[in-house]
Each structure stands twice: as C-alpha cells, then as structure tokens.
Regions:
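Substrate/ligand-engaging "lid" and interaction regions
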Residues: 1-6, 10-390
C-alpha cells in the first residue's frame, strides 16, 4: 500500500482519500471504530458529494480499512508505505505514537523514505508526533528515523459535513464536502519526494501560511459560531448573513489582518482579500453546517492558543486593540449547549465561580490584564444589547 490514512472520518474519506483515489494512488484507512472499519471493508466504496457542484461528485472505489487494534497489520502497512496521513483529531495524536514507532522500526529494516503528513486542526501536530517517536524508538532505528522519515503538516481548507439522513440511508459512508481542492503541505520537512497527488501544493514559507489560515478562518468560524449561538442561530451560513454578526466578523477580520500583515509582512490589502475567501465559505448556503458542531467543546476553543484568545493575544502583541475578538470571546463564555459536556462544565464554572475564573483557568489570562478587562467590558456591552441574559 503506497499510502496509509490514520483515521477514517469525514476529512480522511472526503478529502485525503478522495484526492488519493483521483490520483490513482492505492491507500488504506486505519480506523479506531471497528464498526466503521468493517463497514468500509464490507462496502468497498463510498460517495463524496461536492456541495454546490454535483457534477464533480465521486464514488471512491476499492476502499479498504484496517482496525486500529490490529497492531501487526497497521504497523506492516506503515512499513510498506511511502506516505502516512493522520486525520484523527488533535487530542488523539498521542495514541498514534506507538503505532508509528513500531511501523518506522519495521521500515528501517527494509529502507526507503517515509513521510508522515498531519491533517489536523491542532497546534504543532507534527512536532507532537516527532517528539513522541523520538522518545520511544529503538536505538537501532534512530539513524533511519533522523535521516529518512519526514514529519510535516498540511492545512485542510475543505470542510467535511455530515450528510442528511436520506443520503446516509443510501450510503452510510457518504461525505458532503466543500468544493475546494488545494492541499497545502509544509515543504521544509519533507524527506525525498512525494507521489503526485492531485491538489498537493508544497509551501516553503509554511509558518506564515498556517498562521494566516488559523487566525483568519478559525477566528472567523469561532466568532460566527459563538455569536450566532447567542443570537439563536442553528446554521453557520444563516448566522454569517446576519448584519449584526457581520459587523463583528468584519472587525475580527481587520484585527487579525493587521496583526498578520505586521508579523509576516503580507501587504494588508492581500490579507484582507484572503479574508473574503473565509467569509465566502461561511456564507455558502450549499454548506449545511451547524453551529453546534463548530462550537462544540468551548473550553478547548477558549484556550490561550486557540482561535479566539490566541488570535486576540496575537493582535495585542502587535499593538492593536482586539475589540471584536473580545466580543467573540465574551459570547463563547456564555455558550449553552445541553448535551455538550464541556459546554455544561463552562456554564457551571461561570455560574459558580464567575467570569474571572474562566479567564484564569480556561483562557489562562489575567482577569485584570488588558485582554481580561476588555472581555469583561464586552460582556457588559452584550448585556446592554440584550444578547446576554442572566
């Protein structure tokens, strides 16, 4: 098998697997859910629906999967591969380390380069994996690991959306995806050459590219999700058309654009043009994406390095006041979603310990620091507008 995809979720099937199939590159998924792995093997194919462009819809044939628990089969597949992709969610990256380590140890005996490409919406995912493997790999394979294994990162710009019930009844593996085909990968950490994969674009100055995507797309998504939830919206596209939300969103775009322009020396006009691609995606009515999915786990999304607080810290670093990001942070602190255990924990913390506790324990910010005071100012403003009721 030329490629292995660790994970078989919506992005794994609807983006990575889709592009590999169109590139005629053989691959196998590795999946933790036995039932999903078995279903992929039983059906042997799945449908990728391109939202808004149905003529590009595709049936991915010859789909195969290995159970995550079948360690020997997984590590054999890694040892035979040229490229391993990960699409498991950042929280699960450490679970991959033992499999990657053993697979690399096996591959060190047969030789050839191996590149591991993370497809995660997470901070420094390739570093997490490389550090984990470095700590556990056997002495005999260390030289091979250092010289023949690349661990690098991709930015995933395509969204994978749960299909509706009728489509899932016809094909339980079907994925609805955005009509976006570019697959940017950090060129600096690749060893040797990658196979020719449709859409793959090697980016030499990747740090700037990654931050540009994160602080533009993720900050905008967080803003739309949490402010949209506060105003009673269920769908991202509906919220992104509300003039009240758009005013805040445009402010967030300007704040992050100014900071990114200063940090990476992009022309401001170029960065503002890039924000339009983010807004277009959020407002795309063909992408039926729910706020509940995007706002899920608000405790993580209020973390100091995540989409809102992380963006606000970047903005402050470059001498810009993050007024609109502070509104988004304030909205996130008042997010309510019964059934979301982290949202329920956040509500409990807010009601029992107060906003200062969230700033301190969740956001890791001084409640009386510049950002902490600004967020509290915006909470008062949202109450004044009647958007927050206590």
């Amino acid at each position: 098998m030329k490629c292995v995809i660790l994970g078989a979720g919506k992005i794994a099937r609807g983006f990575v697997g889709h592009l590999l199939f169109l590139s005629k590159i053989p691959f196998a998924f590795v999946e933790k859910s036995d039932s999903l792995a078995d279903m992929i093997n039983e059906r042997g194919q799945y449908t990728v629906n391109i939202l808004g462009n149905p003529q590009k819809n595709c049936v991915v044939r010859g789909a195969k999967a290995i159970r995550f628990s079948d360690v020997e089969a997984v590590t054999d597949a890694i040892a035979e591969a040229e490229v391993v992709f990960t699409s498991v969610g950042g929280k699960n990256l450490k679970d991959l380390v033992p499999l990657l380590t053993e697979g690399i140890e096996k591959k060190s005996k047969t030789g050839g380069n191996l590149n591991v490409i993370t497809c995660e919406n997470w901070k420094l995912p390739a570093t997490v994996l490389r550090n984990g493997v470095e700590e556990t790999i056997c002495e005999e394979a260390k030289e091979y690991f250092e010289n023949h294994v690349g661990m690098t990162e991709a930015v995933i710009m395509r969204s994978g959306i749960e299909a509706d019930k009728e489509l899932l009844e016809m094909d339980p593996l079907i994925v609805n995806v955005q009509d976006f085909w570019e697959f940017p990968v950090d060129a600096s950490r690749i060893v040797g050459e990658l196979p020719p994969i449709l859409g793959l674009k090697l980016i030499p100055e990747f740090t700037g590219f990654l931050e540009r995507k994160f602080y533009t797309y993720n900050a905008a998504n967080g803003t739309t999700s949490f402010v949209g939830a506060l105003l009673g919206y269920e769908k991202i596209a509906d919220a992104a058309h509300d003039e009240r939300i758009l005013k805040i969103l445009d402010g967030v775009y300007m704040e992050t654009a100014q900071a990114l322009s200063k940090k990476h020396h992009f022309p401001l006009e170029e960065q503002l043009a890039f924000t339009l691609t983010s807004k277009k995606k959020l407002q795309d009515d063909t992408i039926v994406d729910f706020i509940e999915r995007n706002a899920r786990d608000p405790i993580r999304k209020l973390g100091k390095d995540d989409r809102l607080v992380g963006s606000a810290r970047l903005v402050l670093e470059y001498g810009i006041r993050p007024d609109h990001l502070a509104i988004a942070i304030a909205a996130a602190m008042y997010y309510v979603s019964p059934g979301d255990e982290f949202a329920e924990k956040l509500v409990k913390m807010r009601e029992e310990e107060g906003i200062d506790a969230i700033l301190e324990k969740v956001c890791e910010q001084d409640p009386n620091g510049e950002l902490g005071l600004l967020v509290k100012e915006k909470i008062a403003l949202l109450k004044e507008w009647g958007w927050i009721h206590e």
